[in-house]
Structure formats: structure tokens, C-alpha cells
Curated annotation (Swiss-Prot):
This is Endoribonuclease YbeY. It comes from Pediococcus pentosaceus (strain ATCC 25745 / CCUG 21536 / LMG 10740 / 183-1w). Its EC number is 3.1.-.-. One of its GO terms (biological process) is rRNA processing. The keyword Protease does not apply. Binds 1 zinc ion. Pfam families: YbeY. Keywords: Cytoplasm, Endonuclease, Hydrolase, Metal-binding, Nuclease, Ribosome biogenesis, rRNA processing, Zinc. The lineage of its organism: Bacteria, Bacillati, Bacillota, Bacilli, Lactobacillales. GO terms for molecular function: metalloendopeptidase activity; RNA endonuclease activity; zinc ion binding. Its main location: cytoplasm. Disulfide bonds: none annotated.
């Protein structure tokens, strides 16, 4: 996978940036995504994610992770199948609040790295069409999330 990370905080430990890349690569392989699939992850503070949450979701508070899925199927562009195969699928962007990562890790009694990995996997699953708004959706997403985390080695 082509994973781009952006650290708007300019404070994140390089090992955590590696963790993001590693766990998303692992999750992509777990879901059998094409190796050229693209995703971006931006780390930020609460004030920035609060602004994004308010603007795009109409929720006036910071949150831990926001997923922006990208649908590459633009109806205005007509491509033959060969051309479509050559263009990598960009599944979207994740925005993660490092402040929320720290708060939630402390509250839940586990490491910052475990919480960061969890939020990456959680957001990644959203970008791949999983949701938890309805009970039946939760029953698909949450066990898969746990399965990926455990297989990667970030157990609770």
C-alpha cells in the first residue's frame, strides 16, 4: 500500500509514524487490498480536528479519528477497463487527534501506541465500507477490528 503520513503537530515520535504505516499495511494485507491502494493519515491536535469535525460533520467538539472515504468512480470520466486497472485506488484520508490518543490511552489503561494503532485500524475499516451505526454493522466491524489488532500483536 502507498501510505502517506502527515504530522501537523511536528511532535510525533518517528516510531509512531512507522507504527501507522506498519499497521495499515498489515490491515490492507489482512483485507487483501491491492498493493497499490493509497491512503493518507494526518496527525493533529484537538483544535484542528475540532474545526474539521464542526465543518464537515456539524459536531462542535474534538473527536479521536475522522475518516474521509474517497470514491474514485467519477461518473464524468469514462475509462476503458485497462486504464482503470492502471490507476491506484485511493481509499481516503484519516485524521487523528494525538491529544485524544493520549487521553483515551490513559483512560483505558493501555499504551499510546496501542490506542494509535486501534484508531488507525478503526478509521481504516470505515474507509473500506465498515460502519457501526446499526447493531448488525457493529457485529461485522468490531470483531474484525479486534481480529486485526490481535493478529498484529496490539492486544488489550
Amino acid at each position: 500500500m502507498d501510505i502517506q503520513t502527515f504530522d501537523h503537530t511536528k511532535e510525533e515520535n518517528p516510531k509512531n509514524l512507522e507504527l501507522i504505516t506498519d499497521i495499515l499495511e498489515f490491515a490492507g494485507n489482512y483485507l487483501h487490498l491491492d498493493e497499490e491502494t493509497e491512503i493518507s493519515v494526518t496527525l493533529m491536535h484537538n483544535d484542528e480536528i475540532h474545526q474539521i469535525n464542526k465543518e464537515y460533520r456539524n459536531v462542535d467538539r474534538p473527536t479521536d479519528v475522522i475518516s474521509f472515504a474517497i470514491n474514485d468512480a467519477d461518473e464524468d470520466i469514462i475509462m476503458d477497463p485497462e486504464m482503470a486497472e492502471e490507476i491506484p485506488a485511493n481509499i481516503g484520508d484519516l485524521m487523528i487527534s494525538v491529544d485524544k490518543v493520549a487521553e483515551q490511552a490513559e483512560f483505558l489503561g493501555h499504551s499510546y501506541e496501542r490506542e494509535l494503532g486501534f484508531l488507525c485500524v478503526h478509521g481504516f475499516l470505515h474507509l473500506n465500507g465498515y460502519d457501526h451505526m446499526e447493531k448488525e454493522d457493529q457485529e461485522k466491524m468490531f470483531p474484525l477490528q479486534k481480529e486485526i489488532m490481535n493478529a498484529y500483536g496490539l492486544k488489550r
